Amino acid sequence: MASWNQRTVAKRVSCTGVGLHSGRPATLTLAPAPADAGITFVRMDLGVEIPARNEHVVDTMLSTSLGRGGARVATVEHVMAALHGMGIDACRVEVDGPEIPILDGSAAPFTCLVQEAGVKVLPAGKRYLVVDQPVEIRDGDKLARLEPADGFSVSFTADFGHPLITDQSFQVKLGERAFEREVARARTFCFRRDIEKMQAMGLAKGGSLENAIVVDEFSILNPEGLRFPDEFARHKVLDAIGDLALFGMPVVGALVAVKSGHAMNQALVKKVLADPAAHRVVRVTGEADAPALRAKVPALAIHEGSAA
C-alpha cells in the first residue's frame, strides 16, 4: 500500500551552486511537507511561498519560472522533474535567491538529494490527473499533445536544424526507476552562437561547460562528450516531465511532443486544466482503490518497498 500513498522527503537536505541565467550563488534545500501540501517553492530571503502549479507560471523564456506577490523562482523544471520522477508528492523547496542552482545541468543531482534524504510515506492517498480525451497545442511544425494512456509516458522529437540534432527522438514510460536510469542524467544544452546573444539579454550568466552541453557548428565542445547518443532529446523529455509536474500531481496519460518548449508545455497544461471533459482527478483513498487504479496505471506504483 505504501507505494499508493503520498510521499515526502524524510529529512532536510541541501545543495549549493549557481543560477544558470542569473549567475548568482544559490542554496537549495528539500524539506519534508505534510500530506496534500504538494510541492511549494519558498523564497527564504523574502518569506514568500509559491505553490508549484501552472497558475503560478510567470515566464517560460528558456526555462520555467514561478512567481507570486512579486517574488519569483526561475529554472524550476529540473528539480520538479526529479521530484516527480522520484515519486515525491509533498515537499518544501527552499531557495535563498531568485533561481534554482543549475548544478551539472541535469536532474541527477536532485535525484541524489532525494536519495540522501530518504522517503517518508504520508497518511493520505496519492492523487492522479487522468487524461480522458486528447488535448493538443500546435504552432506550425511544433506540437504538444496529451492523450489517454496507461501509465505516464513522454515521447519527444527534437530538430534544431543542426547536424548533431536533426530528427532526434526519445520515448520513456515512467515507473520502475526509469527516470533515474534513462532521463535524469541528460544535461541542458545550448549553441555557441547563441551564448553572446543570451548574455546580452541578461541570461546564461552562470553557464559553462560544467553545467551545459555547448555545441558549435559541427561538434560538441565539452571534452567528455555526451552521456547518451540522444542526450538532447532525453533532456527535452526531462524538461517536459518537469513542466507537466506543474499539474500538481502525477499524470496518467501520454505526452507526444515535437519541437515543443516550456511555453508550449505550459499552454498544454493550462488547456487540459480548463477542459473538465478532458481530465479527471482520482485519489487513492485506501488499499481497496489500488487494484482498480493499478489496472489503469500499472507503471505508477514506483519505488515499491523503498520508502521508510
From Swiss-Prot:
Query: What is the E.C. number?
Result: 3.5.1.108
- Give the record's GO biological process terms: lipid A biosynthetic process
| Pathway entry | Glycolipid biosynthesis; lipid IV(A) biosynthesis; lipid IV(A) from (3R)-3-hydroxytetradecanoyl-[acyl-carrier-protein] and UDP-N-acetyl-alpha-D-glucosamine: step 2/6
One annotated GO molecular function: metal ion binding
A Pfam family of the record is LpxC
Reaction(s) catalysed by this chain's protein: a UDP-3-O-[(3R)-3-hydroxyacyl]-N-acetyl-alpha-D-glucosamine + H2O = a UDP-3-O-[(3R)-3-hydroxyacyl]-alpha-D-glucosamine + acetate
Q: What job does this protein perform?
A: Catalyzes the hydrolysis of UDP-3-O-myristoyl-N-acetylglucosamine to form UDP-3-O-myristoylglucosamine and acetate, the committed step in lipid A biosynthesis.
Q: Which family does it belong to?
A: Belongs to the LpxC family.
Q: PANTHER family annotated for this entry?
A: UDP-3-O-ACYL-N-ACETYLGLUCOSAMINE DEACETYLASE 1, MITOCHONDRIAL-RELATED
Which NCBIfam families does this UniProt record tie to the protein?
A: lpxC
Name of this protein: UDP-3-O-acyl-N-acetylglucosamine deacetylase
What species is this protein from?
A: Anaeromyxobacter dehalogenans (strain 2CP-C)
